Curated annotation (Swiss-Prot):
Orotate binds at residues 124, 152. Its EC number is 2.4.2.10. Belongs to the purine/pyrimidine phosphoribosyltransferase family. PyrE subfamily. This is Orotate phosphoribosyltransferase. 5-phospho-alpha-D-ribose 1-diphosphate binds at residues 94-95, 98, 100, 120-128. The keyword Glycosyltransferase applies. InterPro entries: OPRT, Or_phspho_trans_dom, PRibTrfase_dom, PRTase-like. Homodimer. It comes from Thermococcus kodakarensis (strain ATCC BAA-918 / JCM 12380 / KOD1). Its cofactor is Mg(2+). PANTHER family: OROTATE PHOSPHORIBOSYLTRANSFERASE (PTHR19278), URIDINE 5'-MONOPHOSPHATE SYNTHASE (PTHR19278:SF9). Catalyzes the transfer of a ribosyl phosphate group from 5-phosphoribose 1-diphosphate to orotate, leading to the formation of orotidine monophosphate (OMP).
Length: 185
């Protein structure tokens, strides 16, 4: 494991970005833990590290892309940081077309044939990021890969991987393998 990835995993614990309790996820599933990547993505040091890791992973895998995209809301700061890191244009994918102005579901430009690196904060089943991929493809984009900060390992890799290259920076099993035990007082 790289030092940078190890640092990211430590940040999840240091910033208390893993919560335990009862949570309903975007997928509709119930979970006894919640991975709050948004908490990390509001911290400049963590956000910069995520962008650096994503850019490095794309380069290591030989993934070329013209644009970086992310679905609202959780992926927007991540996609923005990665766009800055790679100096590639940013595209934001809305959950639904806006009801005013142009009525577009995309903010930013996508041209037919553009290769897009689509990023997400957390995946469970992969449904949200797959819907974003469909929106981009309707506009003529090609999905170069889908990269996620944390994969919860609940089906997203199989679902997304059936059609796209799927690259999680961290799997939830890696987070839990490093989970700090409560200190005895």
């Amino acid at each position: 494991m790289s030092d940078s990835k190890d640092e990211l995993i430590r940040m999840f614990f240091d910033e208390e970005a893993i919560l335990f309790g009862r949570f309903i996820l975007t997928s509709g599933k119930e979970s006894n833990y919640y991975i709050n990547v948004k908490k990390l993505s509001t911290k400049p040091r963590a956000l910069k590290l995520i962008a650096k890791l994503m850019a490095g992973e794309a380069q290591k895998r030989g993934i070329t892309f013209d644009r970086v995209a992310g679905p609202e809301l959780g992926a927007v700061p991540i996609a923005t940081a990665l766009a800055l890191e790679t100096e590639k244009p940013l595209v934001i994918v809305r959950k639904k077309p806006k009801g005013h102005g142009t009525g577009s579901q995309l903010e930013g430009e996508v041209k037919a044939g553009d290769k897009v690196l689509l990023v997400e904060d957390v995946t469970t089943t992969g449904g949200s990021v797959l819907r974003a991929a469909e929106v981009l493809e309707r506009e003529g984009a090609e999905i170069a890969a889908i990269m996620v900060v944390v994969d919860r390992e609940e089906g997203a890799e199989e679902t997304i991987g059936a059609k796209y290259t799927f690259l999680p920076l961290v799997r939830v099993s890696e987070l839990f393998a490093r989970r700090k035990e409560p200190q005895k007082e």
